């Protein structure tokens, strides 16, 4: 019988003889657990970049939303007054957030604040949503600033007043191609109802969320093909409505513009699973827009196209190299 003075217990097996003590075993187990935790479990088959998540009154609820919806990294949309909150949240959750910045474009003095924010880490200007014309002097100034700073600009196009807001934002979308021509060095990210409604050539500007089959030849579809510096933000009810209207057309659209489309949510639910979402659309009430849109795009596209939309296109435009 071996004496206890002879040292740790020896274990023998078919892999030979080794010395294992309790401290080493616990250390190895902890290392194994850490390794497993470090390996991301992707709910959507790979990393997801959400390019449209507004900074919330309780910033930690942003983290709850991306965790619940299976998003890997999100672009926080912060007003210039809330830049410090966006920075703190990004630092608190390394690798999970980047951020854009916006301000009232009718005040030229805000240009300096936007410039300062970009130089301190903002990856883009947005969401720009003001009651101005998309080809007016205020927005022309923003387009030039985005080009000078070498960051994209994310624009809310809303020509039809909605009951909740009763206002027009960046109006005159039919004329926006002139801006695309005038600012070839600016990367534009188009968002909201007027952009997505205009995928159909018969849009009558009588509702923010048209229904029914899509008639080919819409200006949004055409401009995505014609202008390499125009990208599309697939967030909110506006894009989700487009996805549901005409699945056969939409499948072709996703293939046609697979290098220009970027997933976003613009969702107000609390937990990434629909909690607290009071969206007036019966289609989305009580649901997470992020989940609904990701599921629709995944269902209508190939794995390769879905990969581009959920991650690669946004990462390329924003020059994001890390998935964490």
Model-found features: residue ranges?
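Active-site gating/metal-coordination segments in enzymes
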Residues: 80-171, 231, 236
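Helix C-cap/helix->beta junction micro-motif
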Residues: 93, 148-149, 183-184, 226-227, ...
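An N-terminally biased module of ancient metal coordination in phosphate/nucleic-acid-related enzymes
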Residues: 25-26, 39-95
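N-terminal secretory signal peptides and thylakoid transit peptides that target proteins
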Residues: 6-32
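H/E-rich (His + Asp/Glu) clusters that bind or coordinate divalent metals
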Residues: 2-7, 12-15, 57-60, 195-324
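Charged helix-capping and loop-helix junction motifs
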Residues: 136-143, 168-174, 213-217, 245-249
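Active-site cradle of extracellular carbohydrate-active enzymes
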Residues: 166, 171-183, 188-201, 219
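Hydrophobic faces of well-ordered beta-strands that scaffold small-molecule active sites
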Residues: 49-53, 74-76, 99-101, 125-126, ...
């Amino acid at each position: 019988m071996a004496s206890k003075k002879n040292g740790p217990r020896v274990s023998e097996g078919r892999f030979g003889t080794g010395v294992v003590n309790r401290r080493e075993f616990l250390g190895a187990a902890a290392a194994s657990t850490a390794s497993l935790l470090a390996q991301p479990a992707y709910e959507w088959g790979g990393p997801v970049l959400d390019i449209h998540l507004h900074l919330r009154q309780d910033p930690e609820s942003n983290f709850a939303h991306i965790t619940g919806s299976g998003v890997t990294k999100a672009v926080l949309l912060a007003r210039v007054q809330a830049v410090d909150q966006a920075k703190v949240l990004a630092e608190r959750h390394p690798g999970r957030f980047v951020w854009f910045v916006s301000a009232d474009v009718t005040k030229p003095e805000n240009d300096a604040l936007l410039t300062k924010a970009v130089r301190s880490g903002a990856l883009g200007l947005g969401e720009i949503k003001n009651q101005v014309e998309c080809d007016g002097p205020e927005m022309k100034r923003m387009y030039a600033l985005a080009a000078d700073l070498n960051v994209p600009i994310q624009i809310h196009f809303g020509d039809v007043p909605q009951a909740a807001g009763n206002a027009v934002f960046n109006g005159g979308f039919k004329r926006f191609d002139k801006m695309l021509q005038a600012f070839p060095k600016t990367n534009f990210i188009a968002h909201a109802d007027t952009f997505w409604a205009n995928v159909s050539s018969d849009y009558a500007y009588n509702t923010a969320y048209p229904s029914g089959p899509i008639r080919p030849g819409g200006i949004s579809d055409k401009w995505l093909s014609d202008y390499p510096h125009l990208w599309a933000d697939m967030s909110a009810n506006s894009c989700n409505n487009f996805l549901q209207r005409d699945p056969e057309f939409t499948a072709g659209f996703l293939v046609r513009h697979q290098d220009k489309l970027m997933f976003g949510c613009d969702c107000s639910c609390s937990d990434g699973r629909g909690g607290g979402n009071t969206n007036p659309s019966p289609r989305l009430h009580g649901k997470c827009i992020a989940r609904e849109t990701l599921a629709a795009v995944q269902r209508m596209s190939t794995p390769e196209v879905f990969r581009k939309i959920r991650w690669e296109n946004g990462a390329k435009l924003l020059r994001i190299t890390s998935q964490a």
